[in-house]
């Protein structure tokens, strides 16, 4: 493992480019990596279902790479926000879950997460540690920092508003609650999919408002499902579960369309991209 602040050019290239869509801001993130500070790497998850799939693994692998460089992962269990459901990319309001359902799912999630993330270098924190102490005055003070107009700039909200589809007040609160998680743990870097960019940027802005150094936002690419068209999702039945039987997992991965193989290799493996792209003449093939 490299010591803090000591990062090779190859490690830096891998961390900041492989399986990465965008970093806001990349220059600041690189400076942090070289500063010698042990970074607090935040990833939140809403245990709205009991298991995870390879789409989630894209971000978890990146966290593990940074753990190998000496940094600390903070896993936020969204035991409050999971009851609402993340509205990112949704065309309709989600059904709210009970707190008991969320806690049960969380235990299953964590067991699977630690197949990828090093448990000894990770901290698990439940949102209820701070939201359980919130009173109405705190909620009013927090919501007063943003406007409805700002939140309606989100593409999914804007589309639903234009189509006169319902947007629950709880959904408008969701990005703000996720943002406050960053304040509560003093996050240095937050990780999420490209569909989470708005939420991550709200966290960055809220930290600045509250006197903290704004977090860096690390956006991971969306893994296309086994149908070769849509985002990997259990609701679309185009997913490969982390806890899947190996035979079933193999069968599903063999069904991945040819044009998606390179992205699967890049996002989910350590294979050098130059290796699978090199074609071997049939005369040199080993059978």
Question: Which sequence ranges carry the predicted segments?
Answer:
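Positively charged, low-complexity intrinsically disordered leader regions
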Residues: 2-42
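A glycine-rich phosphate-binding loop feature that marks nucleotide/adenosyl-phosphate handling sites
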Residues: 220-226, 270
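N-terminal catalytic cores of NTP/NDP-binding nucleotidyl/phosphoryl-transfer enzymes
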Residues: 26-87, 189-197, 203
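Conserved phosphate-binding loops in nucleotide/dinucleotide-binding enzymes
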Residues: 93-97, 127, 131, 204-212, ...
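Well-ordered mid-protein domain cores that form the structural environment of catalytic cofactors
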Residues: 64-117
């Amino acid at each position: 493992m490299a010591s803090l602040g000591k990062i090779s050019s190859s490690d830096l290239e891998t961390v900041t480019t492989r399986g990465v869509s965008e970093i806001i801001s990349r220059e600041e993130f690189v400076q942090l990596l070289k500063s010698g500070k042990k970074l607090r790497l935040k990833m939140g998850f809403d245990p709205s279902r009991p298991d995870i799939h390879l789409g989630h693994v894209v971000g978890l692998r990146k966290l593990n790479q940074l753990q190998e460089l000496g940094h600390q992962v903070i896993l936020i269990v969204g035991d409050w926000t999971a009851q609402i459901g993340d509205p990112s990319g949704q065309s309709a309001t989600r059904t709210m879950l009970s707190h008991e359902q969320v806690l049960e799912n969380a235990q299953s999630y964590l067991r699977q997460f630690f197949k990828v993330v090093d448990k000894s270098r990770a901290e698990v924190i439940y949102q209820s540690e701070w939201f359980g102490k919130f009173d109405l005055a705190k909620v009013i003070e927090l919501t007063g920092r943003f406007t409805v107009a700002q939140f309606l700039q989100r593409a999914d909200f804007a589309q639903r508003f234009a189509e006169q589809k319902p947007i629950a007040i709880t959904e408008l609160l969701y990005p703000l609650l996720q943002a406050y998680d960053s304040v509560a743990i003093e996050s240095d870097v937050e990780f999420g999919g490209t569909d989470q960019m708005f939420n991550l940027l709200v966290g960055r802005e809220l930290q600045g408002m509250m006197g903290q150094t704004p977090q860096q936002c690390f956006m991971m690419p969306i893994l296309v499902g086994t149908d070769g068209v849509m985002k990997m999702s259990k609701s679309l039945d185009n997913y490969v579960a982390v806890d899947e039987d190996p035979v079933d997992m193999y069968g599903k991965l063999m069904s991945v369309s040819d044009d998606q193989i390179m992205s699967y290799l890049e996002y989910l493996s350590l294979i050098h991209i130059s290796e699978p792209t090199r074609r071997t003449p049939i005369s040199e093939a080993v059978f």
